[in-house]
UniProtKB/Swiss-Prot annotation:
Belongs to the eukaryotic ribosomal protein eL21 family. This is Large ribosomal subunit protein eL21. Residues 9-21 have a biased composition (Basic residues). GO terms for cellular component: ribonucleoprotein complex; ribosome. It comes from the Archaea. GO terms for biological process: translation. SUPFAM superfamilies: Translation proteins SH3-like domain (SSF50104). The keyword Ribonucleoprotein applies. Keywords: Ribonucleoprotein, Ribosomal protein. It comes from Methanococcus maripaludis (strain C7 / ATCC BAA-1331). The gene is rpl21e.
Amino acid sequence: MQKSEGFRSKTRYKLQKHPRQKGMAPLTRALKCYTEGDRVHVVLDPSVQKGMPHPKFHGKTGVVVAQRGRSFLVRVKDGGKYKDIIARPQHLRESKL
């Protein structure tokens, strides 16, 4: 039988939560607002499927370019070029630098 290559394939450990982190994230994370030029880390939250960018961007750092409804357009460097990804605030963390 042919192996499926879905959106979440090969993410057995990448989209796994530690026991103390299980369940829904706090509401303040979903209501977080970022402004243009903010540096953010893409950290996927497996308990929220909506607005999740592709798992290959997990751990990348980018710059917020614009807001699209509830989501944000983030420019991330992938290899030698920049890519724009759309992600909800649950999957973004503010960079401390």
